[in-house]
């Protein structure tokens, strides 16, 4: 997309017509695989390339778009879209907008979104996110969605080594370190978790939760020790990881 935008700019500089294309995307993948982070980066890139004036990201989901009573969903959806103008609107678990049957107000949100995407096509980029199979069914079920969203980007689950690297980054950022045995215990645990992972596996979120549990267990272990030196305060021991795993 970036190359196309740059080339369009060069065409304009040479007096050639610029071709307009839709930049809307569908992000597929499990939770915690970086979809929101990439959407935020994408918004910034679009601003730098001159596609968007603000380049901010507005995150929402079904709850942010659908109201409880008839006639209110369009109003609610329009308010969210207004805040996203000149930026990117990120709708997480977008497929839930069409899961409530024909009488569900989610269809009103979809209709409102499609109209605003057309009316504000120069000021709004929409990213729909969710599980792969659900998103494909969702997009294919609606001609309006199908005609506007043809760009799919899949976010695969992290490997055990990648999850361990993320875990270590969380530790390093807060000046914690793992003992050698704690490192082995963590690596073994993550390998097992990835092996049995299902669609609801949290990936980076899962690792973040493990990190928070580990430092909590360390605090519990050291709380009654008066003479804690700097190394003790930094080091996460194997028993901290074991107790964290037991609570996961």
What do these predicted regions represent?
Residues 1-23, 194:
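Pre-Walker A (pre-P-loop) alpha-helix and adjacent loop at the N terminus of AAA/AAA+ ATPase modules
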Residues 11-14, 178, 193-248:
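C-terminal helical "lid" subdomain and adjoining coupling/linker elements of P-loop NTPases
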Residues 17-55, 79-82, 149:
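Walker A/P-loop
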Residues 49-54, 134-140, 146, 155-200, ...:
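Conserved C-terminal "switch" segment of AAA+ ATPases
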Residues 55-84:
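Short glycine-rich substrate-engagement loop in P-loop NTPases that contacts/grips substrate
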Residues 62-73, 96-107, 152-154:
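Flexible beta-alpha connector loops of hexameric P-loop NTPases
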Residues 95-127, 133-136, 140-144:
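Conserved catalytic/switch belt of AAA+ P-loop NTPases
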């Amino acid at each position: 997309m970036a190359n196309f935008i740059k080339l369009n700019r060069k065409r304009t500089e040479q007096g050639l017509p610029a071709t307009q294309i839709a930049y809307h995307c569908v992000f597929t993948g499990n939770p915690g695989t970086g979809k929101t982070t990439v959407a935020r980066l994408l918004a910034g890139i679009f601003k730098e390339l001159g596609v968007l004036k603000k380049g901010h990201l507005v995150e929402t989901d079904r709850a942010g778009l659908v109201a409880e009573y008839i006639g209110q969903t369009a109003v609610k959806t329009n308010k969210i879209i207004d805040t996203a103008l000149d930026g990117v609107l990120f709708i997480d678990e977008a497929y839930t907008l069409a899961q409530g049957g024909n009488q569900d107000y989610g269809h009103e949100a979809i209709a409102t979104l499609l109209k605003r995407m057309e009316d504000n096509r120069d000021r709004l980029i929409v990213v729909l996110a969710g599980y792969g199979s659900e998103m494909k069914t969702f997009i294919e079920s609606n001609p309006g969605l199908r005609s506007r969203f043809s760009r799919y980007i899949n976010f695969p689950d992290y490997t055990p080594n990648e999850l361990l690297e993320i875990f270590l980054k969380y530790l390093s950022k807060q000046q914690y370190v793992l003992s050698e045995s704690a490192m082995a215990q963590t690596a073994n645990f993550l390998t097992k978790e990835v092996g049995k992972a299902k669609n609801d596996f949290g990936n980076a979120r899962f690792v973040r939760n493990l990190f928070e549990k580990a430092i909590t267990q360390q605090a519990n272990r050291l709380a009654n020790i008066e003479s804690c030196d700097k190394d003790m305060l930094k080091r996460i021991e194997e028993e901290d990881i074991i107790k964290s795993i037991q609570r996961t």
